[in-house]
Amino acid sequence: MKGDSEMVEETIMLQSIDDVKSFATIANKKKYDVDIVSGKYLINAKSIMGIFSLDLTHPLNVVAYNDGDDNFLEEIDRFIYRPEENK
């Protein structure tokens, strides 16, 4: 599904088990691919076990291959990493 779709990237923080479950639920509702990149690892964001295999103490990069007509960023807004707010 990564062919002609628009790529959206954002940095997120998942700070609890509930955050991971909520994020994976949002990703699973999407018909397009959603990946999380952490260092050299790329995992399917629809996989709760995959997310838990990552180091969740650091921000994660999310890449969604949507059609450009979607509210994915609005849905994950509460997870978006904003370092200026964490000071």
Positions of PLM-derived features:
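A short, aromatic/hydrophobic, helix- or strand-capping loop or linear motif
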Residues: 36-39, 87
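Positively charged, low-complexity intrinsically disordered leader regions
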Residues: 7-15
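Amphipathic alpha-helical interaction surfaces in cytosolic regulatory modules
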Residues: 17-33, 41-56
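Short, ordered loop/turn segments at secondary-structure junctions
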Residues: 39-40, 67
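Short glycine-rich, basic-tinged beta-strand/loop micro-motifs
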Residues: 7, 57-58
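Short, Lys/Arg-enriched N-terminal segments with co-localized hydrophobic residues
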Residues: 1-6
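Conserved beta-strand core positions
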Residues: 10, 32-34, 60
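C-terminal structural segments of small proteins and small subunits
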Residues: 59-87
